[in-house]
Each structure stands twice: as C-alpha cells, then as structure tokens.
Amino acid sequence: MNDIFAIPFKRALQINLKDAFTVVINNTFYQTAASVEADLTQLDKYRDVLFHLDVCQADLNMLKQYYMALKAIAVKLPDDQVEFTWFNTLGLKSSGMTRNSLRFETFNVLYNIGAMYSSLAVEQRLESTEGLKESCRLFKLSAGCFKFIYEHEVSNNFKFFDEYTLNALVSMMLAQAQQMVWKKACFDDIERHSILSRLALQVALFYQTASKNSNCSPYIRTDWVKSLTSKSHYFMAIAYYRSGLHQVQKQNYAQGICDFQYALTWINKLSLDDELTEWRGEVQALLESAERDNDLIYLQASVQNPSKVKPVMMVQADLFDEIEKKDGNIFKNLLPIDVLESCNAFNERVETYVKEHISNPLESMNKLLISNTPQYMDFKSYYISEQEWNSYSDSLQDLEQLRAYVAGELKLSESILQKDIQENEQMIREHGLLRWKIPSKDKKIESLLADLTNIRNYIENGMKVDTETASLFKTLDHDLVTNVSQPPESSDPIMKEASLILQGRKNHILAAERKIIENRLLPKIVSYYKKTGSKDFEPVFQEHIRMFDGDLLQVQKEKAKNKEMLTKVTLSSPEQVQISRNDPRTLYLEELKHSSNVLSELKENIISGKQFYQDLITALESKLKEIEDYVNERKLQRTELNDTLLCDTNES
C-alpha cells in the first residue's frame, strides 16, 4: 500500500504553430507576422518539449516557459483561431479532443505541468525526511495545477475537461501529499498514536473522495479506481489501529478493543499480501491481548462505537509562482486584441459622430428642401443598373429557350403517336381491314392528338406574347434608363440654385466620409498605448474628432442657407411654375417615367411567361408519359393479334 501515483502526461498532436499564428496575425491585425517572427519561432521551440518530455526540472521549466508564452499571446489574439488536439492518457485507451481554442492548449500544458510535479514527487527519496518533505511540496503543487484548471472550467461549463476527472486528480494528489506528512510523522515519533491516527484518517478521506470521483470519470482506468478504494480502506484501518493503540495507552481498554475491531473490518476489505497478512495478525493479537487484560483486570463495559477520530488536514493545493504570470518579453511588439477591439469601437464612434452631427443634418435639410420644391425632380428612383438591364435581355433569351424546349417535347410526343398510327396502317395492309380489328385512331388516340393540338396553340400564343415583349424592350432607350445620358439642366433659376445646394451637401457628406477613411484612429491609439500603456483612449478620441470642427461650422451655415432657400421657393411666382412645365428636365423625367412603366410591364410579362412555360413543360411531361404508356399497350395488342392471325393462316 506504499505505492503512489504519478499522473501520465497528456499527448498533443503536432502542428506548425508558427505557420498557424502567422496566418492569424496577418488576417486579423494591421501588423504583419514578420514583426514578431522571432517570437513565433521561439514559441514553436517551446512547444517541442511536449513531444519528448522527461521527468526532470529542465523540462518542467520548458513547460512553464511555453505556458507563460501562451498566456502572453492569448491576450493579444482571438481565442478561436487555431485548432489544437490533445489525447487523454489516464485510461487503457487513449481518447482525443480537438478544439479551436488557445485556452484549451494553455490548460492542457498546465495539466502536463501538474503531471510533471506528480512524477517528480514520486521520484524523491521517500526513505528520508527531506525527501518526504519535497515530495509533499511537489504533490501540493500538482494538486494546485489541477484545481486551477477545475476552477476555470466551472465558468466554462467543463468544455475542455471532465469535472469528475479533475476532482479525482486534485484529491489523489492531496491524499499523497498528506500521506507524505503521515509518513514523516511516523519517522519522527512512531509512538504518537493520536496524531498518527488523525493524519491517517485524513489520508483515507482524500483517497475516498478520489475513488468516488474516479469511479464517475469516463477516463480513469478501473485498476486505478480499485487501487484508490483499497488505499482509502488501508488508511482507514491505520487510523483506527492507531486510535486503538492510543486508547490502550490511556488504559481505555473497552474503547481500544472497539477501535481494533473496527480496524480489522477495514483490513478484511483488502486483498491481503504477505505484509498485510502479518499486520492483520498483529492487530488481531493486540485485540486479543486487550480483551484478555480487560476481562481479567480492568473489567470495563464493552463499547459499541469506534472512537470519534478528528482528521487533521496538513496539506492544501498550492500554486506555483508563475501560474498567473505571462512572459513579459515575448510578443511585446504585438498589440493586445482588446486594443484592436478598442480601435474598432472608437472607429464606430467616429462614424456615428459624423452621421449624427454632419450627414444626418445635411440629409434632413435636403429632404426638407426637396419636399418644399415641387419643381425639383428626383430621377434616381427611375434609373436601373447596367446589370439589371442585362438581366432583362437575358430573361428574354431564357423565354426563347423555354419555348424551343416545349416545342421540341411537343414534336416528340406527336411523332410517337404518328409512328404508332403508321405501324397500325401497315398491319391493316398486311392482314386486311376485315381481319385487323385494331383501329389506327381510336378514341384515346384522337383525344391525345387533340390535347397536343391545344398545347401547340398555347405555344403559338406564347410566341406572340414573347414577340410583343421583345419588341417592347427594343423601344427602350438604354442610355436613358441606365443614366448614361445625364439629365439636362433646368432653365428655372430657383431650380438651378436648389440643385447646386443639394449637390453641394451630398459632396460634403462624401468628403466627411472620406475624411473618416483617410484619418483612421488606429495609428493614434497605437502610439498612445505604446507611450502610456493606458487603455483609456477617450482623450485620443476627443482630440481626433476635432478634425470635423470645420464640418460642424458648415452644417450651421447650411441651416441658414436652407431657411433662405425655402423663403425663395415660397415667394416664387406662378410664371416659374409655368416655366417648369416646359423645362427640359420635366420632359426628360416624363420620358424616364414612361420607360420605367414599360420596364414594369416587361418584368411582369417575363415572370408570367416563365411560369407559363414551366406549366406547359409539366403538362407535356405528364402527357408524354401517358402517350408512351398507351402506345406500348397498343404495340402489345398488335403483337398478340398479329401472332394469332399468322397462326390461323398456317393452320389453314
């Protein structure tokens, strides 16, 4: 029962970490990966230790370096950009897990640091006091690693690790740390039965918790579960064996007898080797001796319950010094992701500021001026894009192709019926009309031919509509509806002035938007962060938006100009309204409106035309199947009748 557990290292799948992070940095940052190439190379070297781990202080230090480097880059990169795969090694079969997460990689490296501490603890000289103390320290650090992962996984809903497995590992490491304390106490004074009992009971309780959680874990092997259970029973037996010695030492023989009996119940649950068999004999002998002394000398009344031993916990999970630290030297030149996110947030604030204080007011003024200027004409709603124009042309060609397909299917259907009629006529010529009883055109054939004639009429009508639609499209002026030919200037002086004001405001909005693009906040925020280390970028934002002070002043001027213009429009004479009726822009708009109406009619014709041909295709496919089935039936009838007539001829 003196054997102790070392947690096996998890295994990782090899990846080229440098290449993976290079892609992420180049795609995510305004910086290039070349600026941190040396750091990426170093990170790759750190990760190499995962694939040739030895139980030694040097490899532990390498694991810690990699762990701290990961924590350094984790605050500067998105978490979900690189895929990592790790394999559990606690069971007889290895099972893998793959996640796109830097945190997943970081916690698995921390897991291996915990495993390394446990392996180093096992390798200490446990026959010496110093060896036991060092082993205890290392087991506590191992427990600290697993507990640290557990506490972070609670908030992560255990996406990366199993809850029971982590709990089992923490309890297992604490049990072994407590076991080292108990063993050292045995070395120090084997006769201090009370303290040894209390220390042993806490060891038993730790192992008991580890056993329960291991049993619920999907990863921990069964023989470990059994061993943990046995260890719990073993130290429970030790606790009450020592308690019995303590009670006998105090001449509480009845209580001592009860404790020895209780210790034996735990011993009997164990698989006994030679050493345990010998110890059971020793406990049995002590029990019998105590019973004899009590019966002959002390005559104490028998006790039914074992002593209430109070466990004493001498260990807790400890954290190694670097567990919360980041490597301060690696990736120094790479900006943290939250700084970049702040840049994006402040860029959005700049855009919102320009929209609220410049774009929206100018657009509102334009709308107000247009709504109060009846002569003003807005052509934009009537124009179509070159792509939309081409879509009309392509749709007309689609109609032609659909019509051609339907005509081809109709021709095929007609040819099948005509061939059947001709074959039947040939049989009539061979056997004579009196002997051949199958008509060339029965009612069904006549009905099918009539249906095909109706479909042909539909196709011809569709062709007429298609021709009219195509002719309608040809009447349109491409340059007019696609705004290739710009609208003429108005002859109305108020309209001319209004148009200039409206266009000037549109240009001002575009200029303000260009100013946003050409003067990004990112360089200023980067410079401010490098100078101060502060992530409070509000002063940078306030200084940045001062570039729009001139635009804000222009907005105020435009407000005054809008009032002046609205007054002019209100006071405009009826003659100006008459001018607008003969205005070149008015005539241009009328032609554009007419073209827009034609396009609406075209669109409706194309949509209904496509549906028309789709319906015809469906009807023809159904009719063709009906024709083929009936023609096959008639062929079978002709074959049977022909065979019968030939047989009669031969017999006669």
Swiss-Prot record:
Name assigned to this protein:
pH-response regulator protein palA/RIM20
Entries under InterPro entries matching the protein:
ALIX_V_dom, BRO1_dom, BRO1_sf
User: Which one Pfam family would you cite for this protein?
Assistant: ALIX_LYPXL_bnd
Per the UniProt entry, the signal peptide is none
Which PANTHER family does the record cross-reference, listed alphabetically?
A: PCD6 INTERACTING PROTEIN-RELATED, PROGRAMMED CELL DEATH 6-INTERACTING PROTEIN
Q: Which domain of life is it from?
A: Eukaryota
Oligomer and partners: Interacts with RIM101 by binding to its two YPX[LI] motifs.
Per its database record, what is this protein's job? Required for the proteolytic cleavage of the transcription factor RIM101 in response to alkaline ambient pH. May act as a scaffold protein that recruits the calpain-like protease RIM13 via VPS32 to its substrate RIM101.
Q: Which family does it belong to?
A: Belongs to the palA/RIM20 family.
**What GO terms fall under cellular component here?**
endosome
Domain BRO1 intervals: 3-369
